[in-house]
């Protein structure tokens, strides 16, 4: 299940993911307007959901209540490009309150990691009185390089993976967790990481000559993925279009 409204780059990635999954699984597409999810579906995969309606969130909720498994790739932030510049914009999935109900908070911040992958990006360079813009392959702190030493901690989930690059990620945490469910984090950055609400993702080597971006004095491992398992309480007191949706 992916949003009908997504960038061409994301659409390409979703198509690649679908192609790989089709080698082993039967794939069923669901529209954003879906109000009922067949219980025969083994796994509901939500890729970059965007502005889901209350009816759709209710369908997801009831699928989970019926014992279904749900995997969500989501962030409160999105990346957009204009000309040669890239920037961060807000992203609303429609699942924010539903996730909080289950104790999952995705912070409105970006994670940076000194252990990162490279990224070709336009960089301004001064030559005498002139400034030129050229594309350089730089170590990009927002492209978090997760290696086998981290992945092996959750080998049942990450089996066969030796490396993952997690791009423009936000911190994920557990708050006010429902006591009937258990959680474990399965994906994290290195200990040389930090998060910030500074969303300038264009490097400035004139101001920050080391890596092109400001760093934090305090660095620590940051969680990027979590698994919840067990019994869940519905977010809804009643079906949509009726009063009193429980947002606690």
Q: What does each model-found stretch correspond to?
A:
Residues 4-248:
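Acidic, S/T/G-rich, low-cysteine, solvent-exposed domains in lumenal/extracellular/periplasmic regions
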């Amino acid at each position: 299940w992916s949003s009908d409204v997504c960038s061409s780059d994301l659409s390409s990635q979703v198509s690649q993911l679908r192609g790989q999954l089709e080698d082993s699984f039967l794939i069923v597409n669901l529209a954003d307007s879906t109000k009922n999810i067949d219980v025969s579906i083994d796994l509901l995969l939500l890729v970059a959901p965007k502005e889901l309606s209350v009816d759709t969130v209710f369908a997801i909720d009831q699928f989970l209540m019926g014992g279904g498994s749900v995997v969500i790739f989501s962030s409160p932030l999105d990346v957009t490009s204009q000309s040669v510049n890239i920037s961060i914009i807000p992203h609303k999935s429609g699942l924010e309150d539903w996730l909080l109900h289950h104790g999952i908070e995705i912070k409105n911040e970006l994670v940076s990691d000194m252990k990162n992958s490279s990224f070709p990006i336009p960089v301004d360079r001064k030559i005498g009185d002139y400034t030129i813009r050229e594309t350089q392959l730089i170590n990009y702190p927002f492209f978090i390089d997760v290696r086998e030493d981290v992945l092996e901690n959750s080998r049942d989930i990450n089996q066969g993976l030796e490396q993952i690059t997690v791009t423009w990620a936000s911190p994920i945490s557990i708050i006010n967790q429902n006591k009937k469910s258990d959680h474990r984090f399965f994906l994290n950055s290195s200990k040389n990481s930090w998060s910030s609400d500074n969303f300038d993702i264009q490097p400035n080597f004139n101001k920050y000559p080391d890596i092109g971006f400001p760093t934090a004095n305090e660095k620590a491992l940051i969680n990027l993925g979590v698994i919840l398992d067990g019994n869940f309480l519905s977010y809804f007191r009643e079906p949509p279009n009726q009063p009193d949706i429980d947002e606690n």
